[in-house]
Amino acid sequence: MTAIIERRESANLWSRFCDWITSTENRLYIGWFGVLMIPTLLTATSVFIIAFIAAPPVDIDGIREPVSGSLLYGNNIISGAIIPTSAAIGLHFYPIWEAASVDEWLYNGGPYELIVLHFLLGVACYMGREWELSFRLGMRPWIAVAYSAPVAAATAVFLIYPIGQGSFSDGMPLGISGTFNFMIVFQAEHNILMHPFHMLGVAGVFGGSLFSAMHGSLVTSSLIRETTENQSANAGYKFGQEEETYNIVAAHGYFGRLIFQYASFNNSRSLHFFLAAWPVAGIWFTALGISTMAFNLNGFNFNQSVVDSQGRVINTWADIINRANLGMEVMHERNAHNFPLDLAAVESISIGG
């Protein structure tokens, strides 16, 4: 009898726990994805803060030349970063217990791998949690689909690119100047500016900013006034009201006359789908571009592609970009390579008689 009562209480406790986890009445929804999201993001955030403040220099290139990234080792907010895991580790899974000591783990950049892997798991679970909450509220799933774009972008630079290049040391550093360094080296080695998927990403991000500004300003300029001239127009709005808060017909008429009629949406659903889909598709393409360049399927190479009738090269902007790429490649990891990879791959020219 005692065993049966204990079993019932245990089952009842588990049932109450499940109800609490999946309840949409909580101030912050947890969900089953949240059970994994909360510890992984807390771990990533905690280690990031500690390492950004106090981590010792990391031997990123595996050549016994540590690079300082933390505040206590001479950096400021702009120059500081979590330095990627050493090239000596490559793609090996490198938890603390795999190192001979904590000092060795820090020297080889163990915190970077810990932060990145927990962060990627956490943001993927955040996306799943968005879907889970939408499902429980009877909403459609497109919020999670939109969030998949930044998740794909983060996965591309922190996981896919290191896998393609063979080492976590090629991942993006977790800091401002480190991000710029990553961008410059990426351009030097992969010519990303000449990759069509990057161009689509630029169109997505800048276009999304433009459309967001246009939409916000049009809506704000066509609010239906429910107040006097002496009161704020915002005071006429009640949260959850059934009436429209702005006049879409007026906004459509304004924009249609500003450009032309069919440049303006007259359907609010189509408009908001477009506002979501444009930047999301652009960022998807950029993430796909990074993932293909990870395996060295690089941007277009139009170097010395224009020649005159005598076969002499007529330089184009593509040739100027190529010269800049070579210069950037010469500068980066200056002590790790005896010669830039692109130049080292060229056969030597015989100058003998």
From Swiss-Prot:
Residues recorded with modification Phosphothreonine: 2
Cofactor note text: The D1/D2 heterodimer binds P680, chlorophylls that are the primary electron donor of PSII, and subsequent electron acceptors. It shares a non-heme iron and each subunit binds pheophytin, quinone, additional chlorophylls, carotenoids and lipids. D1 provides most of the ligands for the Mn4-Ca-O5 cluster of the oxygen-evolving complex (OEC). There is also a Cl(-1) ion associated with D1 and D2, which is required for oxygen evolution. The PSII complex binds additional chlorophylls, carotenoids and specific lipids.
Keywords: Acetylation, Calcium, Chlorophyll, Chloroplast, Chromophore, Electron transport, Herbicide resistance, Iron, Magnesium, Manganese, Membrane, Metal-binding, Oxidoreductase, Phosphoprotein, Photosynthesis, Photosystem II, Plastid, Thylakoid, Transmembrane, Transmembrane helix, Transport
Site-annotated residues for Tyrosine radical intermediate: 161
Site (Cleavage): 344-345
One annotated Gene Ontology cellular component of this protein: chloroplast thylakoid membrane
Catalytic reaction annotation: 2 a plastoquinone + 4 hnu + 2 H2O = 2 a plastoquinol + O2
GO molecular function: chlorophyll binding; electron transporter, transferring electrons within the cyclic electron transport pathway of photosynthesis activity; iron ion binding; oxidoreductase activity, acting on diphenols and related substances as donors, oxygen as acceptor; oxygen evolving activity
The protein's enzyme class: oxidoreductase
Binding site for a quinone: 215, 264-265
Annotated residues for binding of chlorophyll a PD1: 198
Residues binding Fe cation: 215, 272
Residues given in the record as [CaMn4O5] cluster binding sites: 170, 189, 332-333, 342, 344
Major subcellular location class: plastid
Positions of the propeptide removed during maturation: 345-353
Keyword presence, rRNA-binding: no
GO biological process, one term: response to herbicide
The keyword Repressor appears for this protein: no
Sites where the protein binds chlorophyll a ChlzD1: 118
Parts of the chain that traverse the membrane: 29-46, 118-133, 142-156, 197-218, 274-288
Post-translational modification: Tyr-161 forms a radical intermediate that is referred to as redox-active TyrZ, YZ or Y-Z.
Role of this protein: Photosystem II (PSII) is a light-driven water:plastoquinone oxidoreductase that uses light energy to abstract electrons from H(2)O, generating O(2) and a proton gradient subsequently used for ATP formation. It consists of a core antenna complex that captures photons, and an electron transfer chain that converts photonic excitation into a charge separation. The D1/D2 (PsbA/PsbD) reaction center heterodimer binds P680, the primary electron donor of PSII as well as several subsequent electron acceptors.
Similarity remark: Belongs to the reaction center PufL/M/PsbA/D family.
Miscellaneous comment: 2 of the reaction center chlorophylls (ChlD1 and ChlD2) are entirely coordinated by water. Herbicides such as atrazine, BNT, diuron or ioxynil bind in the Q(B) binding site and block subsequent electron transfer.
Protein name per UniProt: Photosystem II protein D1
Species annotation: Pinus contorta
Encoding gene per record: psbA-A
